[in-house]
Amino acid sequence: MPVAQKLPHLPESPGVYLWKDVEGQVLYVGKAKRLRSRVRSYWAQEHESSPKTRAMVRKVRDLETIVVPSEAHALILEATLIKEYHPRFNIALRDDKSYPYIRVTVNEPFPRVMVTRRLLDDGARYFGPYTDVGAMRRALNVVKRIFTVRSCHYALPGEAPERPCLDYSIKRCKAPCVGYQSREDYRAMIDEVVWFLDGRTSDVMHHVRERMLDASERLDFERAAELRDALAHLEKMESPSVVLEVEGGDRDVVGYARDGEDACVAVMRIRGGKLLARDHRLLEHAEDEEDGAVLGACLAQWYRTAEARAGELLVPFDFEDRESLEASLDGTHIRVPQRGPRRALVDLADQNARHLLEEFKLAALEADERAVDPVYELQRELGLPRLPRSLVCFDISHAQGTDVVASAVFFENGRPKRSEYRKFKIKVFEGNDDFRSMHEVVTRYFRRRLDEEKPLPDLAVIDGGKGQLGAARAALDELGAPQIGLISLAKREEEIFQYGRPDPVRLPRRSPALRMLQQARDEAHRFAITFQRQKRAARTITSELLKIPGVGPTKRRALLHTFGSVQGVREASVEQIAAIPGFGAASARRLLEALGVAVPDVSAPTIDSPSDPPLS
């Protein structure tokens, strides 16, 4: 039935409506005090509505409505359906995943404490949800350290083991499973766990202190010592708590911040006048929505499902669904303070919300930058186990099989780090064998870093194909360093090979990751060929000088040290060469003549040119 035909038959009752597109996908879930009036308003006020609403109405092809007893029921159902369908036009909690809870099975004779992501109506106590999983883990660690809660899954008292487990031996449990701890004593301890998770640390400390004194009076000094240690740990935890002086003690304080389509709602949980925790939610699809609608949607979708709510909820401003939400919160009163200590708390919560929203925007900006960062792209495209923040690239260079050398250039965060460049002469064998050369160089490079206890690079890049890659892999395996990432880059097709993968990877020509690899490969080639040319030049100079009679290795080194090259020697004067130890004027003249330099004969007479006649 077309939507227009459904409108006249809608009831003027509280309920929830679902707009759907041509494929039956839910576009939007809304609630209404009077369904017919609310749904009709989408067409009656279409020209006055926001661009977002007009875009949704153009896609609407069907309507589903659900009648409920009251506005409070409508609010609850709306939040449930939004979480189920994730409609694209609703204000939604960003990353609305199932956050974990701490579950205490108080419905069992011997309750357990565990983590769960499912909130069930099973009689257990749930604490959370925890957006900060680290905070939840810290709370659980305190519970395990102070309270001897059983960790087994036996359905006590009916199902039980024959003997206590290891937890009993290390005093983490008192073995109620085999009757070493009574049900009454265990339940008293669970009450303290619940108080602790509920933020009533002072009550827990008072109870532990009473039990410690009672144990001392009964001369049970071992038990008294255990309780004393637990009390000391609780006091240490309690000392840094922030005290917020407001009468009444327990309340949740809401802060709100908005930046365009993004919004943040922060809740400070205050118990016994002390700030126990801070939680928050980020919202998306908030464009074209009033702040009141955004705040109400967040509290309905998130805060309403929280287990450990306070009796008072302070919000920064009023919103349309406040009364309906309050009715659904079962004993929590919503207040909008205008001045005084309560308003100061709300202002503090607002400040927290602004800070969290700024952090989120910065994190999003960094994520966008990482998307084009060659280091992150390389890890993503190649599936590398470690982010290649540091990489070393190897290249082999030779001149027609002679003067074989190698280079290792180092890149950090995509940029060359020249202080870490290294060059090598191939020593193990003579001749031209790229595979053996690569094996030798990789072995020498990583062995030296291991010996010097220098950090190893995250990735090694080989200039070459599968053969060079295999040689490098063998070298790393022999050194016991298989955890280092290893790839090779073939020049012709710019194919990237990975050991163990039969097919190469080809990145787009404009890929920042490929350009970074090309830069490293080209830099390694430049560094290697420069060293190879220097080595060849030195060999040429050596052979040329050693052919001259009277010039041995010592004189050759002295000449090269002084003049740098054969050409430098040719351009020197007899006096300059004669000044070098081991040379005299005669040997200097013979050296220059041997190098083909015409040296004037100092013993021949000189002919003076006639002088000009005097001026008359």
From Swiss-Prot:
Family: Belongs to the UvrC family.
GO CC entries: cytoplasm; excinuclease repair complex
Annotated CDD domains: GIY-YIG_UvrC_Cho
Localization annotation: Cytoplasm
InterPro entries cross-referenced by the UniProt entry: GIY-YIG_endonuc (IPR000305), GIY-YIG_endonuc_sf (IPR035901), GIY-YIG_UvrC_Cho (IPR047296), Hlx-hairpin-Hlx_DNA-bd_motif (IPR003583), RuvA_2-like (IPR010994), UVR_dom (IPR001943), UVR_dom_sf (IPR036876), UvrABC_protein_C (IPR050066)
Protein's UniProt name: UvrABC system protein C
UVR domain sequence ranges: 202-237
Keywords tagged on the record: Cytoplasm, DNA damage, DNA excision, DNA repair, Excision nuclease, SOS response
HAMAP family the UniProt entry points to: UvrC
GO process terms (BP): nucleotide-excision repair; SOS response
Protein species of origin: Gemmatimonas aurantiaca (strain DSM 14586 / JCM 11422 / NBRC 100505 / T-27)
Domain GIY-YIG: 12-91
Gene3D superfamilies: 5' to 3' exonuclease, C-terminal subdomain, GIY-YIG endonuclease, UVR domain, UvrC, RNAse H endonuclease domain
Gene this protein is translated from: uvrC
UniProt xrefs under SMART domains: GIYc, HhH1
Gene Ontology MF, one: DNA binding
Oligomer and partners: Interacts with UvrB in an incision complex.
Main location: cytoplasm
Stored SUPFAM superfamilies: C-terminal UvrC-binding domain of UvrB (SSF46600), GIY-YIG endonuclease (SSF82771), RuvA domain 2-like (SSF47781)
Function field: The UvrABC repair system catalyzes the recognition and processing of DNA lesions. UvrC both incises the 5' and 3' sides of the lesion. The N-terminal half is responsible for the 3' incision and the C-terminal half is responsible for the 5' incision.
